[in-house]
Amino acid sequence: MTLNLRVLSPNRVIWDSEVKEIILSTNSGQIGVLPNHASLVAAVDIGVMKIRLNGQWSTMAMMGGFAKIDSDRITILVNNAERDVDIDPREAQENFRIAKADLARAEGKRQAIEADLALKRARTRLEAINASPPVSN
């Protein structure tokens, strides 16, 4: 059995295909979704979503949004997301370095919060390209 996974951003369809399972970062922790999952609506946190296809995992850097799970259909509306294969490792590492420096230099609460969110997004992009574990069926 499979799940129909759709990941949509305001500008484009990021993913639309059948998958075996997903592991999704929500505001209340990670959840695993298999076929015939109970219906659920959840807030998606900034984090890595793992997607199991036929015998292999793919990852996606998710930048927050909402997920609707209904039996075998998952629709995720995100602010932005990037598939692991679309992320340039050097650019991701540089963005992480810059975000860390910005957080260290942040003055005031607002700047610190914005810098912390930027660092979380940069860290998520790095984790997405380093988090594709092999799996066998």
From Swiss-Prot:
Coiled-coil residues: none
Subcellular location: Plastid, Chloroplast thylakoid membrane
InterPro entries: ATP_synth_F1_dsu/esu, ATP_synth_F1_dsu/esu_N, ATP_synth_F1_esu_C, ATPsynth_dsu/esu_N
Protein's UniProt keywords contain Nucleotide-binding: no
SUPFAM superfamilies, A to Z: Epsilon subunit of F1F0-ATP synthase N-terminal domain
Gene3D superfamilies to which the protein is assigned, alphabetical: 6.10.140.480, F0F1 ATP synthase delta/epsilon subunit, N-terminal
Cited HAMAP family: ATP_synth_epsil_bac
Name by which UniProt lists this protein: ATP synthase epsilon chain, chloroplastic
Organism, scientific name: Pinus thunbergii (Japanese black pine)
